[in-house]
């Protein structure tokens, strides 16, 4: 069969493997790569290439991650796999590899284990929207009833964390046997790929979302008015659009009267572009770095939220000592630091460097935020933690 030529016009979807240590995440990643390359064309990556994950730095945090790509007839996938549990925690909290969906790998010889639960909880906290289950090592279990029990257990665990445990796809397979080329197990990998295609919806592109631009700088241009600059995070702003200035102070409305990029006047600014936006009737002192410019009504300012936080270890340049309740660091959102206080979960007295923890944060002034927004925790300009907004209270 002729190999289909790779085209960039297919929808791009980000996925990853999650699950307990030694349940076969990396073997499955290699099996998907091999079976799909063999079936639909593309380059296969083997286990050792994936397992030997390169180090990356995201917000000063060292993370080992492997990125591979593969294709199905209708989509292009970018897939992330991490060697160690700590790498998953860091990856999910910093958003270094944001996932449109995850493949939860559970060894049917073991059933759900502690990290299975922790990865499901993390997925819920950081906003991974869809999970598909791959029950691995099914070639080692002869008892069909046992497989059924494990499947029920996994589904119940997912339901416990508000995923649709009863309805999501569960595929029973063997990554190793598929990698070794046994047809009945290769077919299970194709079944998994088909589940990815049908169960994970096509992600909305940044450009189709409501306009938002974090304000980095403010200038006043004589005879023209006030210009704010920044990189458009999502959406499109057009000349004549009404926009809101949100965060830190009371929300105000104004109109975009011009868009500039590299000293050229444009009709619009789009997601990913650095531009200057001229605001009608806005004074230089009405707006500051740390606020955002957004489509009216699309985002609100908040001060209190629950977050999932990773605290940098000493080796990563973080704190050398634990912190306790009453800790008041700065929380860095998009372009600015805001002081806040923390509340630790019941029964937790202190947090050690290298831990990940759920904490409630109250900021001294409101910031434009949605669930899923990433932030850094800093002390005097030094990053000591990374977090994600899990749930907004006020």
Curated annotation (Swiss-Prot):
**Family annotation (Gene3D superfamilies):** P-loop containing nucleotide triphosphate hydrolases, Translation factors
Q: Where is this region: G5?
A: 174-176
What enzyme class is recorded for this protein? hydrolase
Please tell me whether the keyword ATP-binding is annotated for this protein. no
| UniProt region (G3), positions on chain | 81-84
Locations listed in the record: Cytoplasm
For this chain, the family text in UniProt reads: Belongs to the TRAFAC class translation factor GTPase superfamily. Classic translation factor GTPase family. EF-Tu/EF-1A subfamily.
Describe the function of this protein: GTP hydrolase that promotes the GTP-dependent binding of aminoacyl-tRNA to the A-site of ribosomes during protein biosynthesis.
Description of how the protein assembles with itself and partners = Monomer.
What is the name attached to this protein's record? Elongation factor Tu 1
Q: Which organism is it from?
A: Shewanella sp. (strain MR-4)
- GN (gene name): tuf1
């Amino acid at each position: 069969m002729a190999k289909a030529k790779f085209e960039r016009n297919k929808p791009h979807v980000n996925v990853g493997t999650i699950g307990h240590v030694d349940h076969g995440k990396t073997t499955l990643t290699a099996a998907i790569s091999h079976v799909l390359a063999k079936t639909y064309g593309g380059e296969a990556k083997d286990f050792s290439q994936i397992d030997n994950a390169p180090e990356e730095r995201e917000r000063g945090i060292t993370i080992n991650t492997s990125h591979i790509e593969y294709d199905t007839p209708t989509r292009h996938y970018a897939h992330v796999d991490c060697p160690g549990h700590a790498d998953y925690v860091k990856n999910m909290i910093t958003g270094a590899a944001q996932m449109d969906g995850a493949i939860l790998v559970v060894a049917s010889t073991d059933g759900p284990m502690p990290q299975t639960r922790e990865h499901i909880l993390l997925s819920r906290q950081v906003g991974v929207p869809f999970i598909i289950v791959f029950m691995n090592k099914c070639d080692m279990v002869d008892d069909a009833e046992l497989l059924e029990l494990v499947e029920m257990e996994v589904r119940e665990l997912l339901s416990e964390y508000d995923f649709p445990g009863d309805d999501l796809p569960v595929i029973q397979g063997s990554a190793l046997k598929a990698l070794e080329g046994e047809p009945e197990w290769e077919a299970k990998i194709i079944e998994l790929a088909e589940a990815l295609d049908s169960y994970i919806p096509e992600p909305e592109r940044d450009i189709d979302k409501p306009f938002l631009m974090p304000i980095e700088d403010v200038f006043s241009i004589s005879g023209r008015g006030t210009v704010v600059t920044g990189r458009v995070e999502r959406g499109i702003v057009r000349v004549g659009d009404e926009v809101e200035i949100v965060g830190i102070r009371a929300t105000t409305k104004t109109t975009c009267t011009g868009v500039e990029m590299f000293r050229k006047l444009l009709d619009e600014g789009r997601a990913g572009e650095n531009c200057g936006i001229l605001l009608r009737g806005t004074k230089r002192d009405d707006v500051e770095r740390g606020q955002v410019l957004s489509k009216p009504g699309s985002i609100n300012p908040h001060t209190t939220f629950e977050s999932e936080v990773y605290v940098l270890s000493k080796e990563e340049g973080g704190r050398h000592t634990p912190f306790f309740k009453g800790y008041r660091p700065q929380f860095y959102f998009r372009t600015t630091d805001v002081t806040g206080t923390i509340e630790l979960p019941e029964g937790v007295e202190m947090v050690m460097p290298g831990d990940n923890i759920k904490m409630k944060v109250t900021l001294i002034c409101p910031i434009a935020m949605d669930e899923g927004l990433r932030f850094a925790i800093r002390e005097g300009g030094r990053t000591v933690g990374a977090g994600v907004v899990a749930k907004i209270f006020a």
